[in-house]
Every structure is written in C-alpha cells, then in structure tokens.
C-alpha cells in the first residue's frame, strides 16, 4: 500500500475505507423485462420474412464413392467348345441415350392459394345449400331431422331384454349348485348373491 500511495498515510487509509452504496429501485426488474420484450419485438418486426421457394435442387455429393467408373471385369475366354459368335451390327443404337429433360418447378408468385380457400369454401357451400333448401322447401327441415336423428326408443333392434315390458330381466339362478361353488361362497344354496338375498 505504501508503494502505490505516495501521499500521506492518512489519505491512503481514507481512500481504502470507501464504501459502495447499492440501492435497488422498486420496479427495476420489471422495467428491464419490458425493455427486453420491446427490443425482441422490434427485432422480430423489423426482420424481413423471406420465405422463398428454392427453385434449384442442390447437387448431392457421393461421399463414399469414387468419381471414376469401375474397371470392367476381364473377359474369360474358353478355348474349347464355344458357341458361334453372332454378327455385330456396326450401326449405333439411336434409342440408347435420350436427352434428359430439365426439371421445371412452377411457383405461384402472389395470388391466392386454392388450398387456403378449399375448406372454408366447402363449409360455406354446405351451409348455404342447407339454408337454401330449407327456404325453398318447407318440409326439408323435417326430412333432414328424420333422416339424421335416430329415434332412441327403437334401440338398435337386437336388445330383446330392453324391449321387454318389464324392462331388463335377469336369468334365474339354478336352485342347486356344485359342492365346489357352495364351498367357495360359504353358502348352503350355492351361487353368488348377485341380485340381493336368495
């Protein structure tokens, strides 16, 4: 301390005893949050949204393959009995190589995409057709309700126990039971007491 301070020792001691005051204002954290949110909103709004369509496909590289074609395997000749060779034609094969067509990518610049109108248009057409049919024919609403809403009093057609006059009827339990059932239930009658006392 003596090396740094060339003034009297009392002044150096006073400087080293300085205290730092830290005060927090109410709402400082909220102000920082609002400032950060405003900065992010300004950055997002100001950034251009270039969601363009890529019209050319990138050329893919073959990482694990050589660019040179593989050498053809050597021909093995059989010098014994060989079938006769067919005559070779000297004319080049015209249909062998066809020129490749360039890929055409169509994009709609501007305008309205039909897919964004299809579902709302179909819903509007259906509801509009229903309203028009009900205005033209007064009995259309009755016919529609009869066709769509099923009367639940008829059930599905196969619930014989539900259609009976007494409502649901349970089958009767046989009076006697096997010895194992009687022993398992602990009753002399046997069976399980489903519908109350027996």
From Swiss-Prot:
Phosphorylated. Residues 137-198 are stromal. Residues 1-51 form a transit peptide. The chain crosses the membrane at residues 116-136. Keywords: Chloroplast, Electron transport, Membrane, Phosphoprotein, Plastid, Respiratory chain, Thylakoid, Transit peptide, Transmembrane, Transmembrane helix, Transport. GO terms for biological process: photosynthetic electron transport chain. Belongs to the petO family. It comes from the Eukaryota. GO terms for cellular component: chloroplast thylakoid membrane; cytochrome b6f complex. Its main location: plastid. It is found in: Plastid, Chloroplast thylakoid membrane. Residues 52-115 are lumenal. This is Cytochrome b6-f complex subunit petO, chloroplastic. The cytochrome b6-f complex functions in the linear cross-membrane transport of electrons between photosystem II and I, as well as in cyclic electron flow around photosystem I. Residues 65-111 are annotated as: Disordered.
């Amino acid at each position: 301390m003596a090396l740094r301070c060339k003034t009297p020792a009392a002044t150096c001691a006073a400087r080293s005893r300085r205290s730092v005051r830290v005060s927090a204002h109410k709402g400082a954290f909220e102000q920082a949050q609002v400032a950060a949110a405003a900065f992010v909103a300004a950055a997002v709004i100001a950034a251009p949204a270039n969601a363009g369509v890529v019209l050319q496909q990138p050329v893919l590289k073959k990482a694990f393959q050589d660019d040179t074609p593989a050498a053809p395997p050597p021909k093995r000749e059989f010098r014994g009995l060989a079938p006769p060779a067919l005559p070779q034609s000297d004319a080049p094969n015209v249909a062998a190589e066809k020129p490749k067509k360039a890929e055409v990518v169509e994009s709609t610049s501007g305008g309205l995409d039909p897919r964004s109108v299809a579902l709302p248009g179909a819903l509007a057409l259906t509801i509009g057709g229903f309203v028009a049919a009900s205005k033209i024919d007064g009995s259309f609403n009755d016919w529609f309700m009869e066709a769509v809403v099923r009367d639940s009093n008829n059930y599905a057609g196969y619930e014989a126990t539900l259609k009976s006059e007494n409502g649901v009827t349970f089958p009767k339990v046989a009076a006697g039971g096997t010895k194992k059932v009687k022993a398992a239930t602990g009753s002399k009658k046997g069976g399980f007491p489903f519908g109350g006392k027996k």
